[in-house]
């Protein structure tokens, strides 16, 4: 039994049990609009993730919200699904334990809140309210009922080009608004930070799974402008890494008008193109099911990211259009001056849905189809039945404020993709700050976390630019600096199964 099969069973169980739980605890909110009554109801609600009743905490400052269930836990926070008495709709409430944070971390919360307040876009999670009490910060945000896009990639193994295009265009619309209207770069665009509003699932007629993926689920009928696979509107979340690169009032890079140094202007270009690089990673991951950069050794991984060493591996990319590969290549170009900006992105034929290839076709595929070829690394998308460890209760994520209702199994396959992507994204940010691959490897083990590296570089000169990293590096490095999760192609049962079918 594959990890994906086990994961799918878990999702089905979670969805059905959650439906029963929601039905059993539904409350007629029209009975009483009194604040005290809602406060009492909040204390009686239970966590929908398990059978055992767990009381949802009642926090000062949230009297206008009925807390319904705990969606997940973070390093300093908990996220709840709640009902807003004033708005008369469900919202997500992020409760941050202020008393556990130092000055820099508290500044980071205010920076994130201030950035979210200036962004209003249909593809960005909306911040409705911010409440500060003596011990807590409360962020009241738009609720994305579908959860993280990452879980849907795992659920469907990979997406069709139509669905991937539907998603990445919405991400790009949000990025364009951030860059051109708000003067903001996100700097942490990845599947875990892309949420979605669900749509009705419409099964395909006479669906036949791909020969190389006989267990691949049907993502359903694709409807232009609506979506497929239950995925509708996309929302970018988590602005903990984001940065203001120009002042909206002056429409210039941050600083006095006419006095911006060339390096400040260049920093705007480089910063924006970090988001474009991340979009390339997301598109690559959606189309094949694993990220473009991965390696067993952190130093080698850093080198691959910095030098743009990725491959369109066969057989995974055999049936994907050359036009899609060309777009990804332009997005993952090492030199940010040569990398596509957001306007070039929208002009690409693949984004427009055109069948023609670009005139200057640039991608150079590196295909390795046999285990006997050069050593490659690949996240283990499938594992044996004995390796599956499906938890009885939902596993809480510490990396994202708004969590999917899906429960994530503790398996090498899923966690490997999470970790590989997290390392690659953080390395790219550090490279933007001027670190070489050798420095990245050395400093990573000395400081113990990428968070500390970025914090040292960015907060020594600007307290307002504090960022919170969600990826502690010492979680992936052993005592000798070796990576404990396996990313070797030869050990991948996904690769083995596909190769066997090609031979037969």
Curated annotation (Swiss-Prot):
Keyword Cytoplasm annotated: yes
EC category: transferase
Residues involved in ATP binding: 71-79, 94
Domain Protein kinase, first and last residues per copy: 65-351
SUPFAM superfamilies registered for this protein in UniProt: Protein kinase-like (PK-like)
Keywords attached to this entry: ATP-binding, Calmodulin-binding, Cytoplasm, Kinase, Membrane, Nucleotide-binding, Phosphoprotein, Serine/threonine-protein kinase, Transferase
One Gene Ontology biological process: negative regulation of G2/M transition of mitotic cell cycle
Catalytic activity, as annotated: L-seryl-[protein] + ATP = O-phospho-L-seryl-[protein] + ADP + H(+); L-threonyl-[protein] + ATP = O-phospho-L-threonyl-[protein] + ADP + H(+)
Sites of Phosphothreonine modification: 252
Enzyme Commission no: 2.7.11.17
Gene Ontology, cellular component aspect: ascus epiplasm; cell cortex; cell cortex of cell tip; cytoplasm; division septum; nucleus; prospore membrane
Localization per record: Cytoplasm; Barrier septum; Forespore membrane; Ascus epiplasm
Named cofactor requirement(s): Mg(2+)
Active site location: 188
Molecular function terms from GO: ATP binding; calcium/calmodulin-dependent protein kinase activity; calmodulin binding; protein kinase activity; protein serine kinase activity; protein serine/threonine kinase activity
Coarse class of the protein's main subcellular location: cytoplasm
PROSITE patterns the UniProt entry points to: PROTEIN_KINASE_ATP, PROTEIN_KINASE_DOM, PROTEIN_KINASE_ST
InterPro entries xrefs: Kinase-like_dom_sf (IPR011009), Prot_kinase_dom (IPR000719), Protein_kinase_ATP_BS (IPR017441), Ser/Thr_kinase_AS (IPR008271)
Assembly behavior: Interacts with sty1.
Family per record: Belongs to the protein kinase superfamily. CAMK Ser/Thr protein kinase family. CaMK subfamily.
Protein name per its UniProtKB record: Calcium/calmodulin-dependent protein kinase type II
Organism: Schizosaccharomyces pombe (strain 972 / ATCC 24843)
Organism classification: Eukaryota, Fungi, Dikarya, Ascomycota, Taphrinomycotina
Gene behind the chain: cmk2
